[in-house]
Swiss-Prot record:
Its cofactor is Ca(2+). Residues 32-56 are annotated as: Disordered. It comes from Arabidopsis thaliana (Mouse-ear cress). It is an enzyme of class 4 (lyase). This is Probable pectate lyase 10. Its EC number is 4.2.2.2. Residues 1-28 form the signal peptide. Glycans are attached at residues 41, 76. InterPro entries: AmbAllergen, Pec_lyase, Pectin_lyas_fold, Pectin_lyase_fold/virulence, PEL. The active site is at residue 318. Ca(2+) binds at residues 238, 262, 266. The keyword Glycoprotein applies. It comes from the Eukaryota. The lineage of its organism: Eukaryota, Viridiplantae, Streptophyta, Embryophyta, Tracheophyta. Keywords: Calcium, Glycoprotein, Lyase, Metal-binding, Signal.
Length: 440
């Protein structure tokens, strides 16, 4: 076995060297872009932290020790051996796409190539410059100060938005995003909390990654700027953490969301091509609403992937609650609910695959599903299926409609992994604590 381990180590090392050789020019180009695309604008004149010399606490100096570690992982983890993981991989295709790279901070935009599901084509600000947020204030929603998050998100050009340091941003009014933007909180601790939160309205190509959003409040009846050339009157906002309204190609990944006035993530009014992944959601009532109303038929075109999320303590219902449309709910970990986990009305197609459902102790709340405001003669025709889900503590999923795979083609966006590995796939859900110069 030692001979095998050394061979495995040598092969892994060779592959890594080849990958570094192939990508060295790309890495150099993006590093130059990161450090040189600063202008006189105070928001972009600050380079990102760069600490290539940081000691990697996971490094091992002794090659024999490395071989022994690899050998142990191969022998002790049946699932990892079967799926062919490397030592830093988890089987989560999003995380494995970028988190093994200790130089992630030098090539942040590669994250845009890692999306899966219906929102996989969301590129955010990949093709634009970096914008470094230096100022957590939000004193003027009409004339935002350069260097603030509000000033960044309203720009007409693509931008990859990062943060100079840890900060808590308390928004006075909705943060109305313009198209082709990425909010990237990796490497620092960023929270949007205690005020208004994020609105994605009639735009496209948005990535929100690595931030904390909590304690959002209702705001409005005020003027708010949405682009450099336009501002207007906003009525009262519901107080969602993230509100998606008439928008497409949206990716919400690795955020920690909790305790807001209305929903944590709502997608309505014809929104589609959305992936909600790797988020950690806690302490909230109505978690996710997908679809505006039973009568709003434009939502029949909605396609949403909900994958690798952890629905945690203090959640009550709507994980999600769907209307019309097509919803792929795959490899999520449901550890808490009070009323139900997945609900819907108006004939949505729900494809539940490879999830883990841990029912609450209440004997009257064991059912995963809820048909809202519908009688059985109506909902028995709706296509809701459970395939490969793991039901714990008496949890059960009430299926309906067709069983044929073809009926779920428009609600299928990626291959589901076994529910037995969900704990590993979702272990790092929520905003990550990434350190510059180390694997995240």
């Amino acid at each position: 076995m030692v001979i095998f381990s050394r061979s495995f180590l040598a092969l892994s090392t060779t592959l890594i060297i080849l990958a570094l050789c192939i990508n060295s020019s790309t890495m150099a180009q993006e590093t130059e872009d990161l450090n040189s695309h600063s202008s006189s604008n105070s928001s972009t004149a600050n380079k990102l932290p760069n600490d290539d010399g940081a000691w990697n606490e996971h490094a091992v100096k002794n090659p024999e020790e490395v071989a022994a570690m690899v050998d142990m992982k191969i022998k002790n983890s049946t699932e990892r051996r079967r799926l062919g993981f490397f030592s830093c991989a988890t089987g989560n295709p999003i995380d494995d796409c970028w988190r093994c790279d200790r130089n992630w901070h030098l090539r942040r935009k590669r994250l845009a190539n890692c999306a899966i599901g219906f929102g996989r084509n969301a590129i955010g600000g990949r093709d634009g410059r970096y914008y470094v947020v230096t100022d957590p204030s939000d004193h003027d929603a009409v004339n935002p100060r350069p260097g603030t998050l509000r000033h960044a998100v309203i720009q007409d050009r693509p931008l990859w938005i990062v943060f100079k340091r840890d900060m808590v941003i308390t928004l006075t009014q909705e943060l109305i995003m313009n198209s082709f933007k990425t909010i990237d909180g990796r490497g620092v601790n960023v929270a949007i909390a205690g005020g208004a939160c994020i609105t994605i309205q009639y735009v496209t190509n948005i990535i929100i990654h690595g931030i904390n959003v909590h304690d959002c409040r209702r705001t409005g009846n005020a003027m708010v700027r949405s682009s450099p050339s336009h501002y207007g009157w906003r009525t009262m906002a519901d107080g969602d953490a993230i509100s998606i309204f008439g928008s497409s190609h949206i990716w919400i990944d690795h955020n920690s969301l909790s305790n807001c006035a209305d929903g944590l993530i709502d997608a309505i009014m014809g929104s589609t091509a959305i992936t909600i992944s790797n988020n950690y959601m806690t302490h909230h009532n109505e978690v996710m609403l997908m679809g505006h109303s039973d009568s709003y038929t434009r939502d029949k075109l909605m396609q949403v992937t909900i994958a690798y999320n952890h629905f945690g303590e203090g959640l009550i219902q709507r994980m999600p609650r769907c209307r019309h449309g097509y919803f792929h709910v795959v490899n999520n970990d449901y550890t808490h609910w009070v009323m139900y986990a997945i609900g819907g009305s108006a004939n949505p197609t729900i494809n539940s695959q490879g999830n883990r459902f841990l029912a609450p102790g209440n004997p009257f709340a064991k059912e995963v599903t809820k048909r809202v405001g519908s009688w059985q003669g109506e909902w028995k025709q709706w296509n809701w299926r459970s395939q490969g889900d793991l039901m714990l503590n008496g949890a059960y999923f009430t299926k309906s409609g067709a069983a044929a795979p073809a009926s779920y083609a428009r609600a299928s966006s990626l291959g589901a992994k076994p529910a037995s590995v969900v704990s590993m796939l979702t272990y790092s859900s929520g905003a990550l604590k990434c350190r510059i110069g180390m694997r995240c």
